[in-house]
């Protein structure tokens, strides 16, 4: 049974965007349009929204939900990492706010055929866009044991990754691993069925989902695209659900808000910014006495992540790991690298 999708941190996210009546906004992760409908309500009657999602099923549901807003809502099929080109296709050069709600939605988790959850026995898929790319079953059939262990460790932060990878490789030599229940059982047997609130397969499923959809790569590209699209004073609000995502967002906002600390007295020094003195991908060459010309692009508005209130957690337990970080575009024309 598919649960009703309740958008997490709804009030906090809309407040973070600082909505205004004539603004232009992007929801890079449209989903079932919970946040999008709030953006349109808060920016009415002339505010516009470009809503992006890669899941055809979510798009169908969102189109129905946003139909009352007419031409104020433009819905496109794509990945938010492509938002710069998608915005340009619709004549948008700058926007007043961008929302990214990273990760898998409740309906995706609750539909067995999508293969995201170990709660059901279903095909091992995990693709956000089920019409493109390799499934999780394809991935674990192709990777060697070391690569599989590294993937589970890096993306799932699973300390028993080598044991799990070894068990998967042993099983696939006998028969293909094609279902969620089959994989969950293998992981549980590999780690010894350790007791606890979290299912033993949780981290492995997370790791495979992230890899199948290149979620961290999309996040990095999406943050860069979003920063460049924001008009001065525009807001970027990003909701994450696990430490890997949150770390990327935190570091991106921090780096884009930081002054360059390259001292003028040094002639050659590695520089993290794409300044005019940059002569290669890894270093800037400075004449003596010249500073890096990088100008910060963002101001971080949330020094600590915003989390769900006790009231929201009671209504929506899946919001327990959600974190919202917010930044504002500085009044400068210098674009982020």
Swiss-Prot record:
UniProt keyword annotations, A-Z: Cytoplasm, Methyltransferase, rRNA processing, S-adenosyl-L-methionine, Transferase
Enzyme class, UniProt record, top EC level: transferase
Subcellular location per the Swiss-Prot or TrEMBL entry: Cytoplasm
One of the record's GO cellular component terms: cytoplasm
Any one Gene Ontology molecular-function term assigned to this protein's record: rRNA (cytosine-N4-)-methyltransferase activity
Principal location: cytoplasm
Entries under InterPro entries matching the protein: RsmH (IPR002903), SAM-dep_MeTrfase_MraW_recog (IPR023397), SAM-dependent_MTases_sf (IPR029063)
Positions that bind S-adenosyl-L-methionine: 33-35, 53, 101, 108
Pfam families membership: Methyltransf_5
EC code: 2.1.1.199
GO biological process, one term: rRNA base methylation
Catalyzed reactions per annotation: cytidine(1402) in 16S rRNA + S-adenosyl-L-methionine = N(4)-methylcytidine(1402) in 16S rRNA + S-adenosyl-L-homocysteine + H(+)
Family: Belongs to the methyltransferase superfamily. RsmH family.
HAMAP family named in the record: 16SrRNA_methyltr_H
Name recorded for this polypeptide: Ribosomal RNA small subunit methyltransferase H
